[in-house]
Amino acid sequence: MSKTSIPKNYHDLLGLYDTQRAIGIIKTIFQEKLCAALHLKRVTAPLFVLNDSGLNDDLNGVERPVSFDVPCLDERAEVVHSLAKWKRYALAEYGFRPGQGLVTDMNAIRRDEELDNLHSIYVDQWDWEKVITAKDRTLPFLQETVRDIVDAVCSTADELRWKFPELKAIRLTREPTFITTQELEDLYPDLTPKERENAFTRAHGTVCIMQIGGQLKSGIRHDGRAPDYDDWTLNCDILFWHKALGCALELSSMGIRVDPAAMTRQLEAAGCPERAELPFHKMLLEGKLPLTMGGGIGQSRLCMLLLGKAHIGEVQVSLWDAETKAVCERAGVQLL
């Protein structure tokens, strides 16, 4: 059954032609602003990695990667879910220094994604990573970086409204409100994690929810996180209130990455200490990889947010079930 729902009073602010123009402008302007704010250089990234490299992102630990055999190598490869671990490896290989980082155009297939207004099996995002020092592994440093990203988003929105006056009603809150997952649970103890996100983002406009992955006092986790890239005490999601949909839109998942102590602790907590024997994990535990922070910023989601679109299929080409197509057609929503 389709989870797609188009609001009754929704209407597209831009036609197909201007939507394509705007998407190109957003991707150019935002990447420039992001690179300037975080001191990033664009690099070329892989679409797939070897199965046994340990470089793929396990996400919540249950999603199955798209896998295929490579006869000339006598190996199997898998399409990346994200580049969270590859980026850290690349920073070491390319000789980036503290304060410097990289950004890639990441394209992925997430075959097990449940389709709705915000989710597609095709994922496109800016995957970024930068080298930091031990003294940078703090919540204030994380928050400073979040503010830089939010400022880049809002400045892109400002330029877009100048080019497309039809978007004048789309306004974003430039100052993010920070809250931990435990504080959020304490504030809304009777709501589910997703309901808490919606309630808090509705109230504040732009929010940063920190410390995702570990168990809360209630015994549950706010959301899943793989144990081998983010430090669960130093990570976050950035959410904006999406006026057209009337819900929180998660634009970015990011964080300060695990050091050897945090990785060991989190692998044990997740019940998978054997991962420490994988090549990437061994390099990290042996101190051969730099300390880093990084994240992913959804390209299609940013376009949805800044263009006021009600469905992600209005800004990207993907595959949709018959019911989703029918719901969109009845509402006059044109899927690309």
Q: For each of these PLM feature ranges, what is it?
A:
Residues I109, I179-L336:
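A translation/RNA-centric and nucleic-acid-associated enzymatic feature enriched
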Residues F68-V70, A92-P98, L118-S120, A169, ...:
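A general structural signal for short secondary-structure junctions and capping/turn motifs
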Residues S2-H119, D127-V131:
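Class II aminoacyl-tRNA synthetase-like tRNA-binding/catalytic domains
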Residues D18-R21, I25, I29, R137-E144, ...:
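Generic recognition of stable, solvent-exposed alpha-helical segments in well-folded globular domains
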Residues Q100-L102, V123-D127, H204-T206, G246-A248:
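Extracellular structured ligand-interaction cores
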Residues T104-E195:
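Extended, charged alpha-beta segments that form solvent-exposed binding/catalytic grooves
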Residues L47-N51, P165-L172, D321-K325:
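A glycine-rich phosphate-binding loop feature that marks nucleotide/adenosyl-phosphate handling sites
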